[in-house]
């Protein structure tokens, strides 16, 4: 009777490394936008932890729940990158508020809006 070998442990990267590797693998212009989004999110919501969520960059709260994410247009063959917020994001505003944004370019104006949204979402 032969012994079954123990399953090999799965080697995983830490969240930050996994997110950076995923962004680095994106084609341009998604890669540049992803790098910029990552920097904005890290600067404005340092308490959120980067991780992969459905293979795309995401940022989770202390309970491990994804607050916000972005995905490249290539993921779903769309014409824009998406920045999205989950129910854990503190964006409630009356009875209706946006939870996803299409991004085709990042200028200083969009970066300022994103920074404010990220701060509010993580508050």
Where are the predicted features?
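Charge-dense, helix-prone N-terminal extensions
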Residues: 1-123
């Amino acid at each position: 009777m032969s012994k079954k070998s123990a399953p090999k442990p799965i080697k995983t990267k830490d969240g930050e490394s996994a997110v950076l590797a995923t962004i680095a693998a994106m084609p341009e212009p998604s890669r540049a936008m992803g790098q910029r989004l990552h920097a904005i999110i890290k600067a404005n919501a340092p308490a959120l932890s980067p991780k992969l969520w459905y293979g795309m960059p995401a940022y989770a709260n202390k309970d491990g729940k994804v607050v916000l994410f972005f995905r490249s247009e290539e993921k779903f063959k769309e014409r824009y990158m998406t920045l999205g917020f989950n129910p854990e994001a503190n964006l409630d505003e009356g009875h209706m508020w946006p939870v996803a944004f299409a991004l085709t370019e990042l200028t200083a104006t969009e970066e300022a809006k994103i920074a404010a949204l990220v701060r509010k979402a993580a508050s």
